Regions:
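Active-site neighborhood of HAD-like aspartate-dependent phosphohydrolases
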Residues: 2-50
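Asp-based, Mg2+/Mn2+-dependent phosphohydrolase catalytic module
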Residues: 2-9, 65-88, 96-126, 130-184
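Short, small-residue-rich loop/turn micro-motifs
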Residues: 13-17, 93, 148
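A short alpha-helix capping/helix-coil boundary motif
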Residues: 16-19, 54-56, 87-88, 112-114
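Active-site loop signature of alpha/beta-hydrolase-fold enzymes
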Residues: 16-18, 58, 133, 152
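Residues that scaffold the ATP/ADP-binding catalytic core of kinase and kinase-like folds
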Residues: 18-20, 61, 178
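Short, solvent-exposed loop/turn segments at secondary-structure boundaries
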Residues: 23, 27-30, 61-66, 100-103
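Substrate-recognition element of Asp-dependent hydrolases with the DxDx(T/V) motif
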Residues: 35, 39-72, 85-98, 137
């Protein structure tokens, strides 16, 4: 169950906040307006926003830390233009599936919990579009949420048995509107 009292929502980036696909330059960032409106609503409600994103392209040499920082600067800038604020972005640069920070492992989510002063992530939604996002949320004790943007529709269909009990929404804005209405 979602608990807005913890004042934190965590998101995957690719396919959730922007169109799916590998991004190697700020110009390639195609943000989803529904996601930006959802982030703005969270900001206006006093809820912090964190992002946890696998960025194995760094390990593969198709992206570097400086360019990734520029991509995230653009993400923050555009979110701000919509009235939203992204409090913290963490990423895993490793392509090693055993790396503790790389989803489906819970490391990035647990790091966000520590940063925001939470002893656990119970009730905190982690919104993603892939099975690894759901698995990371479950491993971290967060509430897994699947949005049907990016790879979400395919993930929902392909893994429907495993995702039977996972909250699912068409997009970020719809999810946020639902949670804020429930919390009112």
């Amino acid at each position: 169950m979602i608990n807005m009292d913890k004042k934190l929502v965590l998101f995957d980036r690719d396919g959730v906040l922007n169109e799916a696909g590998r991004i190697t330059r700020p110009e390639e960032l195609r943000l989803l307006s529904n996601a930006l409106r959802g982030i703005a609503r969270l900001t206006q409600a006093g809820i912090r926003v964190g992002i946890c994103t696998n960025q194995g392209g760094i390990a593969h040499g198709v992206l570097d830390e400086i360019t990734l920082a520029r991509i995230h600067d653009k993400l923050r800038l555009v979110a701000g233009e919509f009235g939203g604020h992204i409090d913290r972005i963490v990423h895993c640069a490793s392509a090693d599936s055993d790396h503790p920070l790389r989803k489906p492992n819970p490391g990035m989510l647990l790091d966000q919990a520590r940063h925001f002063g939470l002893t656990d992530l119970s009730g905190v939604p982690f919104v993603g579009d892939n099975l690894v996002d759901v698995q990371a949320a479950q491993a971290a004790g967060a509430v897994p949420v699947l949005v049907r943007t990016g790879h979400g529709k395919n993930t929902a269909y392909k893994h429907r048995a495993a995702l039977r009990d996972v909250l699912s929404y068409p997009n970020v804005e719809t999810a946020v509107n639902h949670w804020l209405k429930e919390a009112a």
